[in-house]
From Swiss-Prot:
Family (UniProt): Belongs to the bacterial ring-hydroxylating dioxygenase beta subunit family.
Protein name: Biphenyl 2,3-dioxygenase subunit beta
Pfam families, alphabetized: Ring_hydroxyl_B
NCBIfam families named among the record's database cross-references: PRK10069.1
Keywords associated with the record: Aromatic hydrocarbons catabolism, Dioxygenase, NAD, Oxidoreductase, Plasmid
InterPro entries named in the record: NTF2-like_dom_sf, Rng_hydr_dOase-bsu
Keyword match Kinase: no
Species this protein is from: Rhodococcus jostii (strain RHA1)
């Protein structure tokens, strides 16, 4: 089970195997999501988000062994992102604007998604999903950023062509110091 309150633990125990067709469906959803982001089809990507989306990327700090539970900032603390649908709409408008200096010229990104683990959520048709990612970004001629980490999502089954909507995403990056000039892209 994904621990929604503690970003340091994705699953408390090894998840039970899920139906292979469900595993395939969710992986295909993630590959489609990555394709939309890589191709800068941001409005189509935004359409995959639930109206009650919570998009959260806590700040990571380096801690000694006995303080690892405090490694990531929590709810109601500072975060790189702590966005709802309205804030995400604003980010979408900015990233697609030709006056946004941080994305003009636009970044070239590549999202690699792997290690997808799924457990049933509390409600029918809801799934808690953990996946690992690498996001490669190249901008201008020499700016290169690589981010690695884990995403903890809540997906809901829908009748849409995509089959699911993203209701919650918590992004746990491996870096404690971000060397990138900005975070003007989506994970």
């Amino acid at each position: 089970m994904i621990d929604a309150e503690s970003p340091t633990t994705a699953f408390r125990t090894k998840p039970a195997p899920v139906d292979p067709s469900l595993q395939h469906e969710i992986e295909q959803f993630y590959y489609w999501e990555a394709k939309l982001l890589n191709d800068r089809r941001f409005q189509e990507w935004f359409d995959l988000l639930a109206e009650d989306i919570h998009y959260f990327m806590p700040i990571r700090t380096t801690r000694i062994m006995r303080e690892t539970a405090q490694e990531y900032s929590g709810a109601r603390e500072y975060a790189h992102f702590d966005d709802n649908a309205q804030m995400m709409r604003g980010r979408l408008r900015k990233i697609t604007s030709d006056v946004s200096w941080s994305e003009n010229p636009a970044s070239r990104t590549r999202h690699v998604i792997s290690n997808v683990m799924i457990v049933d959520g509390e409600k029918p048709g809801e799934y808690h999903v953990s996946s690992v990612f690498i996001v490669y970004r190249n901008r201008l001629e020499r700016q290169l950023d690589i981010f690695a980490g884990e995403r903890k999502d809540i997906l809901r089954r829908t009748g849409s062509e995509a089959g699911f909507e993203l209701a919650k995403r918590t992004i746990l990056i491996d870096q404690s110091t971000i060397l990138s000039n900005n975070l003007s892209f989506f994970f």
